[in-house]
From Swiss-Prot:
The modification N-acetylalanine is found at A2. GO terms for cellular component: axon terminus; cleavage furrow; kinetochore; midbody; presynapse; septin collar; septin complex; septin ring. Septins polymerize into heterooligomeric protein complexes that form filaments, and associate with cellular membranes, actin filaments and microtubules. GTPase activity is required for filament formation. Filaments are assembled from asymmetrical heterotrimers, composed of SEPTIN2, SEPTIN6 and SEPTIN7 that associate head-to-head to form a hexameric unit. Within the trimer, directly interacts with SEPTIN2 and SEPTIN7. Also interacts with SEPTIN9 and SEPTIN12. Interaction with SEPTIN12 alters filament structure. The modification Phosphothreonine is found at T418. Its main location: cytoplasm. Residues 39-305 form the Septin-type G domain. Residues 101-104 are annotated as: G3 motif. It comes from Mus musculus. Expressed in the cerebral cortex (at protein level). Associated with synaptic vesicles in various brain regions, including glomeruli of the olfactory bulb (at protein level). The keyword Transit peptide does not apply. Keywords: Acetylation, Cell cycle, Cell division, Cell projection, Centromere, Chromosome, Cilium, Coiled coil, Cytoplasm, Cytoskeleton, Differentiation, Flagellum, GTP-binding, Kinetochore, Nucleotide-binding, Phosphoprotein, Spermatogenesis. This is Septin-6. The gene is Septin6.
């Protein structure tokens, strides 16, 4: 493009200013490329599918390498997500590739909640990136972006229809990640069955409202090939790292008693189509879609939950400061309301406690009066008994004194008579003879 043809747009009323000579900002694309190459790229793939569908083998085949990883155990009660990151180099371009596998997916008897760990994992990566964005001191240029850029959903080659587990899982994931469905081990069914199976899968996805990733057609440079490849979805793939000699060439293939399936032969499977669409043509679009669509949706929902918004009820622009002040005032209002409620509750409880204490005090007074009355009655009874006892004792003493007096008088009278007799005997001796 000539320098005179370059224009800078500022708005609808901007002017086109021709340049008198070379300025140099036509090198911006080169600067961007050089900077991007020096920083490297990251790409994160989520492989979802039942055990034994060849997920690890397909990853090895896609990147033409043997990824070392810990062998997965399938004895877990639920679905476990296993993440492995690898540094790859092709020419002078570095790629930090993360492969996340769903260990144990579809192994449970009750598969109702099999999708939940996957959704939680994807949301956790979004949340980690959001927290990094919200920091005061951000280091996004060196932050390892772990957001999932594409989900390769492996469909079992049944030849009939999608399983309920597949439909439910893809429906839960389609708003969170770019889904590319693939028919795993497609050499297990015939070509005619495979063609019908593809049509059936596409029909079921549409009827159930599952939104899978569509290769973009708005870029003229790739619109034709992407439009063609959209018609081939879902891709029927075969993976193999084994090289077989076919003719004079060594090719990756799978050998069977009835023949050989060449992985990179488009007449045998769609592996080449998948590799072209996933890596060579649309890798950057997958990264952009993840950030601009899925992450933005998550970010918007989280910020709305936190009370942030772009416009007020009258659809007028609402700045971050205004949002903060509104949220702060709302929080203070809620705090004051809570304080008032707590104060009222405290006052009410104090009143209730006072009423309880007054009632208890009243009961105690009544009990005290009752006991006091009983005590007085008992005291009066005892005093009456004591009075009666004193009267009886006085009467007894009087009777005793009277008896002693009578006894004393009787003794005195008897003594007088005896003396009188003795005197008479002395004076009259004949009385003694008697």
């Amino acid at each position: 493009m000539a320098a005179a043809d370059i224009a800078r747009q500022v708005g609808e009323d901007c002017r086109t200013v021709p340049l008198a000579g070379h300025v140099g900002f036509d090198s911006l694309p080169d600067q961007l490329v050089n900077k991007s190459v020096s920083q490297g790229f990251c790409f994160n793939i989520l492989c979802v599918g039942e055990t034994g569908l060849g997920k690890s083998t397909l990853m090895d085949t896609l990147f033409n390498t043997k990824f070392e990883g810990e062998p997965a155990t399938h004895t877990q009660p639920g679905v476990q997500l296993q993440s492995n990151t690898y540094d790859l180099q092709e020419s002078n371009v570095g790629l930090k590739l993360t492969i996340v596998s769903t260990v144990g997916f579809g192994d449970q008897i009750n598969k109702e909640d099999s999708y939940k760990p996957i959704v939680e994992f994807i949301d956790a990566q979004f949340e980690a990136y959001l927290q990094e964005e919200l920091k005061i001191r951000r280091v996004l240029h060196s932050y390892h972006d772990s957001r999932i850029h594409v989900c390769l959903y492996f469909i079992a080659p049944t030849g009939h229809s999608l399983k309920s587990l597949d439909l439910v899982t893809m429906k839960k994931l389609d708003s969170k990640v770019n889904i590319i469905p693939v028919i795993a081990k497609s050499d297990a069914i015939s070509k005619s069955e495979l063609a019908k199976f593809k049509i059936k899968i596409t029909s079921e996805l549409v009827s159930n409202g599952v939104q899978i990733y569509q290769f973009p057609t708005d870029d003229e440079s790739v619109s034709e090939i992407n439009g063609t490849m959209n018609a081939h979805l879902p891709f029927a793939v075969v993976g193999s790292t084994e090289e077989v000699k076919i003719g004079n060439k060594m090719m990756r293939a799978r050998q069977y008693p009835w023949g050989t399936v060449q992985v990179e032969n488009e007449a045998h499977c769609d592996f080449v189509k998948l590799r072209e669409m996933l890596i060579r043509v649309n890798m950057e679009d997958l990264r952009e879609q993840t950030h601009a669509r899925h992450y933005e949706l998550y970010r918007r929902c989280k910020l709305e939950e936190m009370g942030f918004k772009d416009t007020d009820p009258d659809s007028k622009p609402f700045s971050l400061q205004e949002t903060y002040e509104a949220k702060r005032n709302e929080f203070l209002g809620e705090l004051q309301k809570k304080e008032e409620e707590m104060r009222q509750m405290f006052v009410q409880r104090v009143k209730e406690k006072e009423a309880e204490l007054k009632e208890a005090e009243k009961e105690l007074h009544e009990k005290f009066d009752r006991l006091k009355k009983l005590h007085q009655e008992e005291k009066k009874k005892l005093e009456d008994k004591k009075k009666c006892l004193d009267e009886e004792m006085n009467a007894f003493k009087q009777r005793k004194a009277a008896a002693e007096l009578l006894q004393s008088q009787g003794s005195q009278a008897g003594g007088s008579q005896t003396l009188k007799r003795d005197k008479e005997k002395k004076n009259n001796p004949w009385l003694c003879i008697e």
